[in-house]
Amino acid sequence: MVKITALGCGLIGHYVVERLLERGHDLSVVDINPPLPFSAEVNYIQEDALTYASSIEKQSIVLNLLPGSIGDLVRAPLLERSAIIIDLAFSAEDPDKYLEISKRTGGKMLWDIGVAPGLSNMLVAEGKRKLGDLEEVIIKVGGNPTEPDEGWSYMAPFSPSDVIEEYTRPARIVRNHKMLEVDALGDRHLIQVDGYGEMEAFLTDGLRSLLHIGGKNMAEYTVRWPGHIDKWLAEGSQMDLDDWRFDKSRKEFTWLQVKVSSADEELSWILCDEGGPDGSSMARTTGLVTAACALMAVEKPELIPEGINPPEALAVEAFDYVLKYLKNHGININ
């Protein structure tokens, strides 16, 4: 049986591990902090992930589930060990810088494998396959409580530091085929989200590898309840991160919209999930994409391309595999 190692095990990481356990796979979990209990036995290793990565068994399948601030640090050591990496760490660094290591060792990395970036990239690639040259790509995504409150109207389903990175890292967009770097939180505008009402969208740096797919005009927006960003701008520098602590008892949802258009045709997809008995909506929508790609690495390794690749590089068969896996877990994309 193939062994899988998970580096990091937060809320979403725990969900990913559970999905692999239910398929009967043998997992080791490496985290300096003991994770929540699992439904089946895992080999828990209480160790610094970076230290462990440098000595991991060669050609291991590794899930990089670490926060973005440290997730990049394990990539080179893992690739030096010829690892096959399914990478969810939302880091500022471009993993393509490790291409030479990958070529030399045979290590592989599939990066940004979540909902957005991740599934959103796969949908844009599908749009390009169907429409050809893309005039416009617009991605809007957010994970939020189902109703606003008098505070932040938000709770972080993953590392709060990664959320703050979204709000502070300059956003890269494309205008008339030129990549521009603009302030995050710009182009704020109200939108209607079916079933929830009026919400606010603002620019964030979520295009990442899609910057190179060739669209004429492209942008990614994060979606929050109105008032959230005003509060961030006024109080963010003094906030207590505990204010964003995820409350499992509170109803929440994840919503994703991807629109692509050519000169004369448009395609649009919407995903919406309110979570379930198996996990929160963000854990499900993000973690199921990660888990699907991890299962491909184990059960259909021929679907994982050589080298360092973003989600849009996956072939149609791999894209269909991910969609089927999501559907089997109750997530439909319309």
Regions found by a protein language model. Name each.
Residues 4-8:
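Conserved N-terminal Rossmann-fold NAD(P)-binding element of oxidoreductases
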Residues 89-111:
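Rossmann-fold NAD(P)-binding glycine/threonine-rich loop
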Residues 130-334:
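C-terminal catalytic/substrate-binding lobe primarily of soluble NAD(P)-dependent oxidoreductases
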Residues 25-38:
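NAD(P)-binding Rossmann-fold cofactor-contacting core
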Residues 20:
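Aromatic pocket-lining residues of Rossmann-like dinucleotide-binding sites
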Residues 12:
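Hydrophobic/small residue at the entry helix of a nucleotide-binding pocket
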Residues 45-84, 88-97:
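NAD(P)H-binding glycine-rich loop region in Rossmannoid oxidoreductase-like domains
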